[in-house]
From Swiss-Prot:
Note: The prion state [GAR+] is provoked by the interaction of the two proteins STD1 and PMA1. It involves a complex between a small fraction of the cellular complement of PMA1, and STD1, a much lower-abundance protein, and it is transmissible by non-Mendelian, cytoplasmic inheritance. [GAR+] makes cells resistant to the glucose-associated repression of alternative carbon sources. In contrast to other prion forms, [GAR+] cannot be cured by GdnHCl or by inactivation of the molecular chaperone HSP104.
Extent of the signal sequence: none
Protein name: Plasma membrane ATPase 1
Organism: Saccharomyces cerevisiae (strain ATCC 204508 / S288c)
Swiss-Prot/TrEMBL keywords: Amyloid, ATP-binding, Cell membrane, Hydrogen ion transport, Ion transport, Isopeptide bond, Magnesium, Membrane, Metal-binding, Nucleotide-binding, Phosphoprotein, Prion, Translocase, Transmembrane, Transmembrane helix, Transport, Ubl conjugation
Cellular component GO terms held in the UniProt record: cytosol; eisosome; membrane raft; mitochondrion; plasma membrane
Gene symbol of the encoding locus: PMA1
Pfam families per UniProt: Cation_ATPase_N, E1-E2_ATPase, Hydrolase
């Protein structure tokens, strides 16, 4: 046999090779992505030494041709019956290009102006905008400026934080080839890759980056193709006549031709980009929660305004007075600073995570990560090292591991570029076999025959230092065994032990290689078996264990075989309920009803042999079941599911496309940083949850109190003071972002019924306290005002104090004294309290200054209200009866949900069948 580079091509290739234009060798071939550069340098140095010593170089003697093409989504079969020796005619190319377009993905640009304007859309924003219009109509320019400033602040912060430079689709395009070599009108020509059409015949050879999907049409063809850009897996895949190839794959070894079956958006990569665009649509989970809260508060504002307007109608109040009442209710009815405070809280958390080498690209992902219940993890490069390593070899009696290793390395390629992953693993492992490493350079390679798909082995003929001629082989264990058996009988015990070991390694997911040699004119000797596997990262098992303790279920999604996936899961302590992704029935091909399929995915520990659509589908099914899902990955193949997941996590070494699609990018290797991220996200969630309870209670407090004050007494707090109350409440609690917060040992979610129940009760207690203050302040005995004071000033101080102190109650997991607030939060609240006190003492924005004794009485009364609030909150936090009353527990799955799942699955199958028929 001869090297692929020097061997003749297939008959069809030979017939057109004379027409091949001069081509430059590609500057780069795809290599093992996770290999360390120092190890690669060592291997290159070793290969140079071997080549310089013996003058043997199995680098391709031919010029590496420009990248070729191949395509995806099936076109009519008659379009694919192109003559491989002649190709398409120029006229046919024009017809097909008109029908299918260029081989490129569609550009979908999002307007930055529209994106910015959308930050002014939402229930809370609408109320703020209405308040700004009212303030302008009343010529209240101070309030108008403050409200507009808050609107711009909220929009500006959100826009900057959510804006991501670069397009995910552009990153996906970078994986595609720029040119292709095709047969047109019987000539082999080089064309831009985007001009390839379905039915084109493309040339494939070492180094070719395939720009389309296609099917191999060269008979007796053997290719090894790196599909890591599609599947993320490190091992090259063997391809033969009739096999499918995919866009962005790279030919590692072999020559042949393929017919294009799909181009542009119809390729696997194109469809992956479409999935990313689809997943990018829709509202985030956190946005939905805030909008839901805003809608309810808006309804309450309208109800309060109806009450006020009705009272004003019977009193025949003037329109200006009614509008001022309306402005006051509108300002206090919704938490105008809610978006800014929660965004600041998450931004501070993101800065902390950055110190832990976790870069947050989408702030709302922090909230989603806190509630994640299922972690879907890619295997290669995420749970494993993405590089093959050799395990303990099995040797027959009388053979040393060094002998086996030396023979295997002698039967290894001497390429520097595009070195086979298995050969690289052997050469890297030489450092563990010093005797074999020292002896290797003393042998002279006479002949080298790369992997033969028929004999399933690699063969090298070498000369020992003593001048002895030795034939070395490594390959499929049973084929190597057959080679030896054809030469002479093997002892039964050796034969049985060898086969048993091969079967054991296969069941454990190892890729085993048999090794044998023949000295001179002697007999073949079976030496043993060398198992290899992509090993788990050193910290992955511990990380997975910690994730489980934090309430996460971990599912593995990998492009590897089921056996390999199960062995990896066994080593990591994951479950071994791993299934082939075919059982997901993509494209309507599954037989399971929708509800049964959802149960199947929910209970599985993972899936093997997956493509991007499978990962996307798994995430989608779990989300439809109500789970918050996180997805980790590092390759182009992971981009759609990273974008679809509630929290997409790109691990260290991820491709640009994966980083762009992810919400959080880890710079540290493996998943260990995710533990800190989970804990931090739950701390941040606790801060946000406590602030939202606090802020809703404040809005309800003022709606109830001011609504009754206006309706019953036909009076209200000054509008300027209302604005200051709203500002003070949010300024003081901005420091909640730095508060000392606990983290939950389980995933946390927005328990909205319980949240509203707590907020309503706290708001009512606050309103009662304010009403008592209002109605008793002028009593001759026991009234708050003793000598002199202003009603507006006293009410402003009482409301400010009790509202500001409420955050100390809602922030604690237990009684308010059980957790000490951070100095930032305590300092901010105290500073606002001092300012509010000065407002009252010196009559700023009120009629008159207030006596110091009156101010002290307000402080004492407010402390009493604070204690009552603390008691109510503690009882609600610890009461199971309150939980049941608020219906905060997750509802059990209803039969109607399963019926909908079954119906949708049936409709999908019908739709797919209809598409095939038409």
């Amino acid at each position: 046999m001869t090297d692929t580079s020097s061997s003749s091509s297939s008959s069809s290739a030979s017939s057109v090779s004379a027409h091949q234009p001069t081509q430059e060798k590609p500057a780069k071939t795809y290599d093992d992505a996770a290999s360390e550069s120092s190890d690669d340098d060592d291997i290159d140095a070793l290969i140079e030494e071997l080549q310089s010593n013996h003058g043997v170089d199995d680098e391709d003697s031919d010029n590496d041709g420009p990248v070729a093409a191949g395509e995806a989504r099936p076109v009519p079969e008659e379009y694919l019956q192109t003559d491989p020796s002649y190709g398409l005619t120029s006229d046919e190319v024009l017809k097909r290009r008109k029908k299918y377009g260029l081989n490129q993905m569609a550009d979908e640009k999002e307007s930055l102006v529209v994106k910015f304007v959308m930050f002014f859309v939402g229930p809370i924003q609408f109320v703020m905008e209405a308040a700004a219009i009212l303030a302008a109509g009343l010529s209240d320019w101070v309030d108008f400026g403050v409200i507009c400033g808050l609107l711009m602040l909220n929009a500006g912060v959100g826009f900057v934080q959510e804006f991501q430079a670069g397009s995910i689709v552009d990153e996906l395009k970078k994986t595609l080839a720029n040119t292709a070599v095709v047969i047109r009108d019987g000539q082999l020509v080089e064309i831009p890759a985007n001009e390839v059409v379905p039915g084109d015949i493309l040339q494939l050879e070492d180094g070719t980056v395939i720009p389309t999907d296609g099917r191999i049409v060269t008979e007796d063809c053997f290719l090894q193709i790196d599909q890591s850009a599609i599947t993320g897996e490190s091992l090259a895949v063997d391809k033969h006549y009739g096999d499918q190839t995919f866009s962005s794959s790279t030919v590692k070894r072999g020559e042949g031709f393929m017919v294009v079956t799909a181009t542009g958006d119809n390729t696997f990569v194109g469809r992956a980009a479409a999935l990313v665009n689809k997943a990018a649509g829709g509202q985030g989970h956190f946005t939905e929660v805030l909008n839901g809260i805003g809608i309810i508060l808006l309804v309450l504002v309208i109800a309060t305004l109806l009450l006020v307007w009705t009272a004003c109608f019977y009193r025949t109040n003037g329109i200006v007075r009614i509008l001022r009442y309306t402005l006051g209710i509108t300002i206090i009815g919704v938490p105008v600073g809610l978006p800014a405070v929660v965004t600041t809280t998450m931004a501070v958390g993101a800065a902390y995570l950055a110190k832990k080498q976790a870069i947050v690209q989408k702030l709302s992902a922090i909230e989603s990560l806190a509630g994640v219940e299922i972690l879907c993890s890619d295997k290669t490069g995420t749970l494993t090292k993405n590089k093959l390593s050799l395990h303990e070899p099995y040797t027959v009696e009388g053979v040393s591991p060094d002998d086996l290793m030396l023979t295997a390395c002698l039967a290894a390629s001497r390429k520097k570029k595009g070195l086979d992953a298995i050969d690289k693993a052997f050469l890297k492992s030489l450092k563990q076999y010093p005797k074999a490493k020292d002896a290797l350079t003393k042998y002279k390679v006479l002949e080298f025959h790369p992997f033969d798909p028929v004999s399933k082995k690699v063969t090298a003929v070498v000369e020992s230092p003593e001048g002895e001629r030795i034939v070395c082989v490594k390959g499929a264990p049973l084929f190597v065994l057959k080679t030896v058996e054809e030469d002479h009988p093997i002892p039964e015990d050796v034969h049985e032990n060898y086969e048993n070991k091969v079967a054991e390694l296969a069941s454990r997911g190892f890729r085993a290689l048999g090794v044998a040699r023949k000295r001179g004119e002697g007999h073949w000797e079976i030496l043993g078996v060398m198992p290899c596997m992509d090993p788990p990262r050193d910290d992955t098992a511990q990380t997975v264990s910690e994730a489980r303790h934090l309430g996460l279920r971990v599912k593995m999604l990998t492009g590897d075989a089921v056996g390999i996936a199960k062995e990896t899961c066994r080593q990591l302590g994951l479950g071994t309920n791993i299934y082939n992704a075919e059982r997901l029935g993509l494209g309507g091909g599954g037989d399971m009803p929708g509800s049964e399929l959802a149960d199947f995915v929910e209970n599985a520990d993972g899936f093997a042999e997956v493509f991007p659509q499978h990962k996307y589908r798994v995430v989608e099914i779990l989300q439809n079941r109500g789970y918050l899902v996180a997805m980790t990955g590092d390759g182009v193949n992971d981009a759609p599911s990273l974008k679809k997941a509630d929290t997409g996590i790109a691990v260290e070494g991820a491709t640009d496309a994966a980083r762009s699609a992810a919400d959080i990018v880890f710079l540290a290797p493996g998943l260990s940083a995710i533990i800190d991220a989970l804990k931090t996200s739950r701390q941040i969630f606790h801060r946000m949850y406590s602030y939202v309870v606090y802020r809703i209670a404040l809005s309800l407090h003022l709606e109830i109190f001011l609504g009754l004050w206006i309706a019953i007494l036909d009076n209200s707090l000054d509008i300027d003071l209302i604005v200051f109350i709203a500002i003070f409440a949010d300024v003081a609690t901005l420091a909640i972002a730095y508060d000392n917060a606990p983290y939950s040992p389980k995933p946390v979610k927005w328990n909205l019924p319980r949240l509203w129940g707590m907020s309503i009760i706290l708001g009512i207690v606050l309103a009662i306290g304010s009403w008592i203050t209002l109605t008793t302040m002028f009593l001759p005995k026991g009234g708050i005002i003793q000598n002199f004071g202003a009603m507006n000033g006293i009410m402003f101080l009482q409301i400010s104090l009790t509202e500001n102190w409420l955050i100390f109650i809602t922030r604690a997991a237990g009684p308010f004294w059980s957790s000490i607030p951070s100095w930032q939060l305590a300092g901010a609240v105290f500073a606002v309290d001092i300012i509010a006190t000065m407002f009252t003492l010196f009559g700023w924005w009120s009629e008159n200054w207030t006596d110091i004794v009156t101010v002290v009485r307000v402080w004492i009364w407010s402390i009493g209200i604070f204690c009552v609030l603390g008691g109510f909150y503690y009882e609600m936090s610890t009461s199971e009866a309150f939980d049941r009353l608020m219906n905060g527990k997750p509802m059990k799955e209803k039969k109607s949900t399963r019926s909908v799942e079954d119906f949708m699955a049936a409709m999908q199958r019908v739709s797919t069948q209809h598409e095939k028929e038409t």
